[in-house]
A protein has these predicted regions:
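Hydrophobic faces of well-ordered beta-strands that scaffold small-molecule active sites
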Residues: 77-79, 104-109, 167-171, 245-249, ...
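Aromatic-lined substrate-binding rim segments of carbohydrate-active enzymes
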Residues: 100-104, 111-216, 227-228, 233-239, ...
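Beta-strand-rich domain onsets/edges
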Residues: 19-86, 106, 119, 125-126, ...
Length: 501
């Protein structure tokens, strides 16, 4: 794949030039994303993503040639790896896997409770026959398999470790009944008499009760929910410790907080998802905080990107929760939104202009944490020639703007392959076709990550072997010849001004 990525460079370069005024986008769009705006994006990228390196290569005469090559990014460019071994042919799987370590330096591993633990007490850590490539290659209707997009955890983790990339676990706790919360929680652990009480009340009757009244009505299930939530967190922490570098501890709970449903001391939360343990976000962070090593980052993640989410994070931290990273999402699931953006029209998502993006991120940054754009979707409307160009232009301009945000630590693309999303997600939001043919959006992203945002320089040494340059933060390899003509190499990490050899 490395050769393929570089081999596509000419096409990627042509695409980047065309995007300066790509006719797929309207004049109204380009007025919003004009040269002055692009220069401001560049200025912020230089300010926030680069640092000044200072090298002293002892014994190197003045004027000697020094080659500087960035070999990895400090910034996280990720994608989920939910389709691991599931694409139907060895060639497709190979192309998919080769993206991790070339384009992506991070992978999000699926730990959705509902499919991770299909039966209580039987988490799917290890692969079974149904998790093998052979099983999926023979599968005629993969989307209807119960574990579609939910590979067993350990093979995906081991693969990412073999590539030397960062791993992100998603999620530990989430109230969503469709995607995460197992039915067996209620079916197996709510006693028959308590089930009968709930069914007799019905949804409307239950809604009239206070959390305290509900907890009194179903005391056993209230305790069992809390116990099983804690058990899940403990199992994941004990299994992976420091192998997985970060976790979405709680996913999409800010709506409950914004509605006043997260009440300290309550035994039950009347979540918009359904019944949850009381103050479940606080409880989750209190549980996992002592379990994971300090070098494992504990994230909160949400689709809300407003003051309510910032207030939630500040509240949790004020109450003693260790939260290291604040995750935010931007799913342009509706292809019409991408068409509207291309036509210069305004959509409800805060991505209409760079200034709107910066303002939104400034709101989240008030929590004082690094930001992770944890789930990104940009569709190619109709997936025709124009639609794919729209996707590519939006990808380039949005990634550039997000990359320019000071507190941003990473961006994670969601569905890498067309027609491989969850039911209800667009089938045309991939960087690749279903057959793993690269789309223009892939070339646009690859051009940024592996070309424009990687520093490669040939410099001349100054007096006393001193070499200075400004480059993107990350790991560098420096090559030179000493006074005797022997080849020399050294590596260093550029994280702040003054770093070097």
């Amino acid at each position: 794949m490395k050769h393929a990525v570089m081999g596509w460079g000419m096409l990627a370069a042509a695409l980047a030039l065309a995007q300066e005024q790509n006719p797929a986008m309207s004049d109204a769009y380009w007025k919003l994303w004009n040269p002055e705006v692009q220069r401001e994006i560049d200025r912020r990228i230089d300010q926030n993503r680069k640092a000044d390196a200072a090298l002293t290569l002892t014994g190197l005469p003045a004027g000697a040639e020094v080659k500087v090559e960035q070999i990895s990014h400090a910034f996280i460019f990720g994608a989920h790896i939910f389709n691991f071994k599931q694409l139907g042919t060895a060639e497709r799987n190979r192309k998919y896997e080769e993206l991790y370590g070339t384009l992506f330096n991070s992978a999000t591993i699926a730990f959705y409770w509902k499919k991770f633990e299909l039966e209580p007490g039987k988490p799917r850590f290890e692969a079974e026959e149904r998790d093998t490539a052979a099983y999926w290659d023979a599968c005629k209707d993969p989307k209807n398999e119960i574990h579609w997009r939910r590979p067993a955890a350990e093979p995906a983790v081991a693969f990412c470790e073999s590539k030397g990339i960062r791993l992100h676990g998603h999620p530990i706790i989430w109230g969503n009944r469709k995607w995460h919360h197992p039915e067996w929680l209620f079916e197996t652990f709510c006693p028959a008499d308590e089930k009968e009480k709930i069914l007799k009340l019905g949804k409307e009757g239950l809604a009239k009760l206070t959390p305290a009244q509900i907890a009194e009505l179903i005391p056993v299930y209230t305790r069992e929910m809390k116990r099983l939530f804690e058990k899940r967190a403990v199992e994941l922490a004990q299994r992976y410790q420091g192998r997985i570098h970060s976790w979405d501890v709680v996913n999409e709970s800010a709506t409950d907080f914004s509605r006043g449903l997260m009440v300290p001391g309550d035994a039950i939360c009347k979540s918009h998802y359904g019944l949850m343990p009381g103050d479940y976000t606080w409880q989750a962070f209190q549980t996992v905080g002592p379990l994971f090593p300090k070098n494992v980052k504990l994230n909160i993640n949400d689709y809300l990107n407003n003051e309510a989410y910032t207030r939630q994070v500040n509240d949790l931290r004020a109450r003693g929760c260790r939260i290291d990273i604040m995750g935010t999402q931007m799913h342009l699931f509706n292809p019409q939104d991408c068409l509207k953006l291309a036509d210069g029209q305004t959509i409800s998502k805060p991505v209409n202009t760079p200034q709107q993006i910066w303002d939104t991120m400034d709101t989240l940054a008030k929590a004082g944490l690094p930001l992770h754009l944890s789930e990104i979707t940009i569709t190619s409307p109709n997936n025709d020639a124009r639609g794919q160009q729209i996707q590519a232009v939006l990808t380039r301009n949005l990634y550039r703007t997000w990359f320019s945000v000071g507190p941003m630590m990473g961006i994670t693309w969601w569905n890498v392959v067309d027609d491989c999303g969850a039911p209800g997600e667009p089938s045309v939001s991939g960087l690749f076709s279903r057959d793993m043919a690269p789309k223009p959006a892939f070339h646009a992203m690859n051009k940024l990550i592996n070309d424009e945002w990687k520093t490669r320089l040939t410099l001349k040494a100054g007096a006393d072997g001193k070499v200075a340059f400004r480059g993107f933060k990350g790991t560098y390899r420096v090559s030179w010849k000493d006074a005797a003509g022997a080849e020399k190499q050294a590596e260093f990490r550029l994280a702040k001004d003054g770093d070097g050899i």
